[in-house]
A protein has these predicted regions:
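Conserved N-terminal phosphate-binding loop of PLP-dependent enzymes in the Aspartate aminotransferase
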Residues: 1-433
């Protein structure tokens, strides 16, 4: 067993001043039976806690650290930017530079606006869609998490699912009634809802690759149905690529599946590990945003120079490496192949999902296509697996509903060590029914 004595003490102290001792619920290691390691530093593919334990990290700050932690070029760029000031609250040429870079990678984003979090991005995109269409209702998919905005915390995934509360207290009935929900990957249910309510729906928002009920890719024809029906009813189609952006492929899920949404939300990677996100899309929709239009959205720290600098440098580093996304996809495939072999040897039913460099596993005998399937996986086996991996210095997300991430910094040796650890962890999972 690893020693988490200092982390446990730090956790108890944190609980005095923060709800649950954390600033985001899943970090509290709910239901895992151990305190969360309190992190001190991270470099490359490794992360170290205050007890001195060093782990191979597959959380990657929940997605942003695609190059690995503390990448020298990114750190240097941030340091240079900080010497000029940490914030201006005024326009900079860097904001235009990152917008041009993002448009180059995502041509469907003709105009965009920087914000500080994925939640801000999705909230703002929905407001823009409502302003553009003059409609009130939105449609989302069960188990897809789009941040903690009121209208989006209805049958949500991620931490809400981890705590068994896909709906949140504090969301008014009036807000909830304008949010329609259908199962992810259920084409007939979606088509039926659009037939009944399509002309009232301002936007359909979806994670094109669901990453908050673990990793669940779209079934064949699902995204095509979304595009077809939204065009038919004049509804704005929003791809929430905060998580899967730059990971399913460098050009995102919309390139992988050849579906072009009206709007896109991005985050995580575009801040290079600092707080940054963006929403954007078709010119005529984005022209509704103030000061050009009547849809208001603003932010003191939007376009913060440190976050924008980190994002620009991260994207440039990725673009400079030939076949960057293919390299990460192969690393991920190699890891999952080893995990599946370990599960087979231990006699543990395991479903492995991957989309580029985001991935996840389900302790399940049947494939997982939606939130109901994800909830049916064996949570007790996941806990046994997770704790065994943690004790072998493999840092994974402490919830079966969270996706894992590969980085460019992960070496062949890292992957080999992780597969070796999986052999023992699957044996532990096999002891649990």
């Amino acid at each position: 067993m690893i020693d988490l004595t200092k982390s446990k003490a730090a956790f108890e102290e944190a609980k005095k001043y923060m709800p649950g001792g954390v600033n985001s619920p899943v970090r509290s290691y709910p239901h895992m039976g151990c305190p969360p390691p309190f992190i001190q530093e991270a470099h490359g593919s490794h992360i170290t806690d205050i007890d001195g334990n060093t782990y191979i990290d597959y959380v990657g700050s929940w997605g942003p650290m695609v190059l690995g932690h503390a990448h020298p070029a990114v750190i240097k760029a941030i340091q240079k930017a900080a010497e000029r000031s940490t914030s201006y609250g005024a326009p900079t040429v860097m904001e235009t530079e990152i917008a041009e870079l993002i448009h180059q990678v995502y041509p469907s984003i003709e105009k965009m606006r920087m914000v500080n979090s994925g939640t801000e991005a999705t909230m703002s995109a929905l407001r823009a869609a409502r302003g553009y269409t003059g409609r009130d209702k939105i449609l989302k998919f069960e188990g897809c998490y789009h941040g903690h905005g009121d209208s989006l915390l209805v049958k949500a995934g991620s931490g809400a699912a981890t705590f068994g509360s896909p709906d949140s207290a504090g969301v008014t009935k009036g807000t909830a009634k304008d949010t329609l929900v259908v199962p992810y990957n259920d084409i007939p249910a979606f088509t039926k809802m659009m037939d009944e309510k399509g002309d009232e729906i301002a936007a359909v928002i979806v994670e094109p690759v669901a990453g908050n009920m673990c990793c669940v890719p779209p079934v064949e024809g699902f995204l095509e149905a979304l595009r077809r029906e939204t065009e038919k009813h004049g509804t704005v189609l929003i791809f929430d690529e905060v998580m899967c952006g730059f990971r399913t492929t460098f050009h995102g899920a919309q390139a992988r599946y050849h579906i072009h949404p009206d709007m896109t939300c991005l985050g995580k990677i575009i801040g290079g590990g600092l707080p940054a996100a963006a929403y954007g899309g078709r010119r005529e929709i984005m022209n509704c945003i103030a000061p050009d239009g009547s849809v208001y959205q603003a932010g003191t720290l939007s376009g913060n120079p440190l976050a924008v600098t980190a994002g620009i440098e991260t994207l440039k580093q990725m673009m400079a490496i030939p076949d960057f996304d293919k390299i990460l996809e192969k690393k991920t495939k190699d890891l999952l192949t080893g995990w599946k072999q370990a599960a087979d040897k231990a006699g543990v039913p395991l479903v492995c999902h991957q989309s580029g460099s985001m991935f996840g596993i389900f302790f399940s005998e049947k494939d997982v296509l939606n939130y109901h399937d994800a909830c049916s996986a064996n949570a007790a086996q996941f806990k046994a697996w997770f704790l065994s991996m943690l004790n072998q210095h493999i840092y994974l997300a402490p919830s079966p509903f969270e996706t894992l991430f590969m980085s460019y910094a992960h070496s062949d040796e890292d992957i080999e060590k992780t597969i070796k650890a999986a052999d023992k962890a699957m044996e532990e999972a096999a002891k649990v029914k």
